């Protein structure tokens, strides 16, 4: 199109030809352009007229006016068609045949095709029509198709759209609610973990304080002993070169007393017993703890005694339970014990009298009396030991409570 436009352009105004006129030399120009040139020649030649020369080849012509020049109807028609093509939309091309315009309509397949598709392609035996006829036919078909489509299931589609949007909104609300539950669950879980962490770390701080209370006094004792030793060495350094007997003897007496005090001061042990928690602590023991059992996390306890397995915060409750249990268990025992003791003492007197009677009555029961006496003595000793054991247990529990200040 650009090359064609060059051939349809006037050399003077550089625009498409407007009412083109052809000169005897066969060059074409717009009528208005030639009129302008002729008017210029008339103004420049006041005394005599100069011949008209072609603007392209400069060949003179005897034309006296533009109207006398021949109209180039062929060129004028080409320019008019070119303007129509230029204004009209660009014609689509065939995808299967490069550059071929889609200028034929296939009625069989109801689609645009090119000339090659119609003569040598898959549409060779189909029915064709012109673009104008196809346009008129499809325009009528469009009206009926559009009307039927406009009412096709529109209400059903709108109803389903409303249902889907409602379901979507409810689903999102449920998901949001579940999401909030999950968030709340993990917040509680995090709170539980933080609580357990703070609890265990607090136990560690308590143990650190206990360690410092155990070691600091011994360390201070050793520092005091070392300081006394340095003072003794300073005294020795001060008077070892003294030549006055009195002064030397006084200093020697002071030095000997200082050495005596230092030697008599016992050194604290260097290996204090460590806490069982420090020996047995290992976080790998927590690896099997499930999230649902996270509240069961605790520091490892001493496995040597039952008391050490009880968490420190439960000691008061444990002691109360022990005291109540002992009181409930041993109250009837103690009651029976003292009443049994009185009965046994009575039985012993009666058996002694009875054995004396049997001894006087017959000698063959002498051995039986001996065994009865042994039995009564054994029961008496058992009751005494049971009473002593009960008192020892109660005293130990009371001392334990007072010592650790659990109540």
UniProtKB/Swiss-Prot annotation:
It catalyses: S-ubiquitinyl-[E2 ubiquitin-conjugating enzyme]-L-cysteine + [acceptor protein]-L-lysine = [E2 ubiquitin-conjugating enzyme]-L-cysteine + N(6)-ubiquitinyl-[acceptor protein]-L-lysine. A zinc finger (RING-type) spans 10-58. Auto-ubiquitinated; requires the RING-type zinc finger. Auto-polyubiquitination leads to proteasomal degradation. Residues 172-200 form a coiled coil. InterPro entries: TRIM/RBCC, Znf-RING_euk, Znf_B-box, Znf_RING, Znf_RING/FYVE/PHD, Znf_RING_CS. Endoplasmic reticulum (ER) membrane anchored E3 ligase involved in the retrotranslocation and turnover of membrane and secretory proteins from the ER through a set of processes named ER-associated degradation (ERAD). This process acts on misfolded proteins as well as in the regulated degradation of correctly folded proteins. Enhances ionizing radiation-induced p53/TP53 stability and apoptosis via ubiquitinating MDM2 and AKT1 and decreasing AKT1 kinase activity through MDM2 and AKT1 proteasomal degradation. Regulates ER stress-induced autophagy, and may act as a tumor suppressor. This is E3 ubiquitin-protein ligase TRIM13. The lineage of its organism: Eukaryota, Metazoa, Chordata, Craniata, Vertebrata. The gene is TRIM13.
